A protein has these predicted regions:
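Helix-loop junctions and terminal segments of transmembrane helices
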Residues: 63-82, 153-154
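Membrane-interface helix-loop junctions in multi-pass transport and translocation proteins
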Residues: 1, 164, 174-217
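Interfacial/gating helices of multi-pass transporter permease domains
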Residues: 16, 36-59, 127-134
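Interhelical loop/hinge segments that connect adjacent transmembrane helices in multipass membrane
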Residues: 1-27, 225-232
Length: 232
């Protein structure tokens, strides 16, 4: 009986780990897609890396401080009789993550140029580079709330032992990211004409924002269905 129980628990854990690992790996496909389109613009890949570094450092600190304490709470409240408590914690998490990201995003938007100058402007990193990275930082700031909301909702699904839904969302996100990268970057390239829009490298950041927005909406509706339409 003990061996059978352990095997059952191991099988259940594998059903969670396999889709979750694949979902995490799919994020790198989106990064490679962005770099492919960035290669069509001189200096775009480097600018994306510089701006992304400025975003990921504070984002990682804030996300860990919010998501790590909430995950065990979601797990402990996953039983059906605790739906109302689970929904309350989800609402609290969404409010906290959104408000913190709006605050962080507003800093990036309002202080983008001073931040880039302070961190990067030296040597061959001239004013033109400052302007490009500052614009990217503003674009990242606009989409900040959707980054953490998506990650929070994914943790909720893991907490209720559903890793397949985030996996499906990650799969669809790859296709959406490919389309939005093509549609928003605009201009011409050695590979032919792109879409009529001309957002340039900023379009790659807005593409990520739209993909994260889609993920948030899709996950919210799926979660609402799982919680008997009590979430929304």
């Amino acid at each position: 009986f003990s061996i059978k129980t352990k095997y059952s628990e191991l099988k259940r854990a594998f059903r969670m780990i396999a889709p979750a690992s694949l979902s995490s790996g799919m994020i790198q496909i989106n990064v490679l897609t962005d770099l492919f389109f960035a290669s069509k613009i001189v200096g775009a890949a480097a600018a994306l890396s510089y701006a992304n570094f400025l975003v990921q450092a504070p984002l990682g600190i804030v996300s860990n401080s919010i998501l790590i304490p909430l995950l065990p709470v979601f797990v402990s409240l996953r039983s059906r009789e605790n739906n109302f408590k689970l929904i309350k914690k989800i609402h609290q998490g969404l409010i906290l993550s959104t408000s913190s990201m709006i605050f962080l995003g507003s800093i990036f938007i309002s202080l983008s140029t001073p931040i880039v100058i302070l961190i990067y402007e030296r040597g061959s990193f001239n004013q033109n580079a400052v302007d490009v990275v500052s614009q990217l930082l503003i674009a990242y700031g606009i989409g900040m709330p959707f980054y953490l909301c998506r990650d929070l909702l994914v943790r909720v699904f893991y907490g209720i032992e559903d890793a397949k839904t985030p996996f499906r969302v990650s799969t669809i996100a790859i296709l959406l990211n490919l389309f939005f990268d093509w549609f928003l970057i605009g201009g011409s390239s050695p590979w032919g004409e792109l879409s009529p829009l001309h957002l340039g490298v900023n379009g790659l950041v807005f593409s990520t924002t739209f993909v994260n927005l889609f993920a948030c909406i899709f996950l919210l509706f799926e979660l609402n269905n799982k919680l008997d339409n009590l979430l929304l």
